[in-house]
Amino acid sequence: MNAWEVNFDGLVGLTHHYAGLSFGNEASTRHRFQVSNPRLAAKQGLLKMKALADAGFPQAVIPPHERPFIPVLRQLGFSGSDEQVLEKVARQAPHWLSSVSSASPMWVANAATIAPSADTLDGKVHLTVANLNNKFHRSLEAPVTESLLKAIFNDEEKFSVHSALPQVALLGDEGAANHNRLGGHYGEPGMQLFVYGREEGNDTLPSRYPARQTREASEAVARLNQVNPQQVIFAQQNPDVIDQGVFHNDVIAVSNRQVLFCHQQAFARQSQLLANLRARVNGFMAIEVPATQVSVSDAVSTYLFNSQLLSRDDGSMVLVLPQECREHAGVWCYLNELLAADNPISELKVFDLRESMANGGGPACLRLRVVLTQEERRAVNPAVMMNDTLFNALNDWVDRYYRDRLTAADLADPQLLREGREALDVLSQLLNLGSVYPFQREGGGNG
């Protein structure tokens, strides 16, 4: 059956700031306390969405979350009106304010793990929300992510959206950022590659940075998504690269159809994994980048592998990269050699995503890949699909509500909270989502 990959990109939120919240993510740590520009960040993301949609790649948008997230501050013991809660936390424990104001939901590669209908036992598209258990600021995302996905994939005959796994370290799940799918045409059954960093009883672990994904979580997600057991491979990420800042697999590998583009040090027992994939995926091609050409350190600083690998109708592929790749002489030299070599990659598209990159999120972090048949595409909430009208409406919306300068101190401004809620109220109507945000269901909280 014919099917297409639709990229659902996260729209950057109004409180995008640099707080260094993500230990193990070196860009996040390095840019802590830098002044951010939320308006520019949102526009950079929108430009990528529109350019890819114009190039013929189906594209949609996932909206930001409510931030600062007052309900969690109340759970932490801060009381009073919403304004009083903000004032108290800013004075007594400002680190909590930064955590509950993070715009991290924009990296929707961590929103969920997807199983296309061609791979599932019941013939539905399955989406399991990620619990993002390893980081407090990200663990807050799951309930609203679930509401948003249910508002977008709202036809229960075709889509099953599953709640996140229990919030315990044993079941740490980071979503599609640790998941690849390999195969022929999108509509054919594919091989799902789940990548984990640790498992109970296995002492092969990173020592410097945490392994966020567990094998136990990956296995549970595969079960929830009803993936045919014959179409699943579980593989461990190389713990040495986690210790070099590869906090998700999509920082060191990306797949599309029959191609796996990865660093030669991406996986534990890599040669064994690639042999397994060759045996099980027709026409499988591994493009392994040698450390002699691109070091792990350079891969992390440029986000070479946090790229999007997209298929044209003729079978050729486009590699979507951040500007940092073009600015690094060694990486750009390698990429031009890649273009000249015998493989399906025939074009490089480069985007300026610096606002997101400074927090450790490149092109692949910003998108959730969902393979859909024509009938399934028609069943998706049409208001989220990118086109000229939506692009212009979202640009105007960003101009109206987003600040062009934000520091950690600004997060305590009650006006920022009000601006954010008004903006999301308007956006949820624009995207025909209904009342997906807690403040909409609670009448604006206790302000």
Curated annotation (Swiss-Prot):
Catalytic activity: N(2)-succinyl-L-arginine + 2 H2O + 2 H(+) = N(2)-succinyl-L-ornithine + 2 NH4(+) + CO2
Entry keywords, A to Z: Arginine metabolism, Hydrolase
Annotated residues for binding of substrate: 19-28, 110, 137-138, 212, 250, 359
Active-site residue list: E174, H248, C365
EC code(s) of this entry: 3.5.3.23
Subunit structure: Homodimer.
Function: Catalyzes the hydrolysis of N(2)-succinylarginine into N(2)-succinylornithine, ammonia and CO(2).
Family listed: Belongs to the succinylarginine dihydrolase family.
Descriptive protein name: N-succinylarginine dihydrolase
Origin species: Escherichia coli (strain ATCC 8739 / DSM 1576 / NBRC 3972 / NCIMB 8545 / WDCM 00012 / Crooks)
Gene of this entry: astB
